[in-house]
Amino acid sequence: MNLTRIAQPGRLRLVIAAVIAAIAGLLISLSQVASARTAEAAAAGDGPKPSIVLVHGAWADTSSWDGVIKRLQADGYTVYAPSNRLRGLPYDSAYLADFLHSISGPIVLVGHSYGGAVITNAATGDPQVKALVYVDAFAPAQGQTLAQLLASSPGSCAVPASLTVVPFPGAPSGVGDAYIKQSVFPSCMANGLPPTKAHVLAVTQLPIATIALTQKSGVPAWKTIPSWAVVGTTDHAIPLALQLAMAYRAHADITRVHAPHLSMISNPGTVTNVILQAVLATS
């Protein structure tokens, strides 16, 4: 009797089973890779990655976005942080609109504080701007001024007694550059930040021309462009109730964060995540 031949069918079955198991394992691995790539593609969106434009507000400068910029660049985004001129709402909005026209492709436009009013006007009618993100920001309606908005919801620390107004050449009569007094800045703008950081920010703040507070806003971009809002719940400059009222009116997706008026400095990760939400929702 040939014992080898008798054993062969059993060995063949073992070989076949091993091959089937190997193929099954390979298919599972390929499926997992495909699923991961599908998830990555979904996260990236179908269209080109938008450029992110960050607009600072009054009593700040472009460095206020440093923590957000680093995170966005690490994710592969092209980021711009143009200097907001702070000369007046029509001028600043026109300047930003021209800057946006220098960028190719889709844009997610982010504004902090007074920068929110600027993006509200600059993006109107611009098809490149796919999303607006307001960070502790003004989102005025047509015909409103920032002074009117602040008067409608008392509690702001940015009152005349907190300001130092300095004349500048060529300014219209009664107009000057307004600074937050250095003694007031930490509690007004930077409450919750380390004292050393708050004092540096007080020294490096950029002033805003007082006329910007009384100039009427134009047709708001948030009427036609999807909007998001980061609302600092301990903001002493723009009262929480006012921020929420403006965000609700703009039908913005709202994220509350325990932060002062400078939430992009105190909570850059949260602000970055909201920007990325806007990117994904509009890609």
Language-model features and meaning:
Residues 26-46, 283:
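C-terminal region of N-terminal signal peptides and the immediate post-cleavage residues
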Residues 44-103:
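Active-site catalytic motif of lipid deacylating hydrolases and related acyltransferases
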Residues 110-115, 119:
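Gly/Ala-rich beta-loop-alpha elbow adjacent to hydrolase catalytic centers
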Residues 128-129, 133-173, 209-211, 238, ...:
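Flexible "cap/lid" loop of the alpha/beta hydrolase fold
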Residues 174-207, 211-220:
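Conserved alpha/beta-hydrolase catalytic His-Asp/Glu region
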Residues 203-250, 255-268:
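Conserved serine/cysteine hydrolase catalytic core
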Residues 265-281:
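Post-His helix in hydrolase/transferase enzymes
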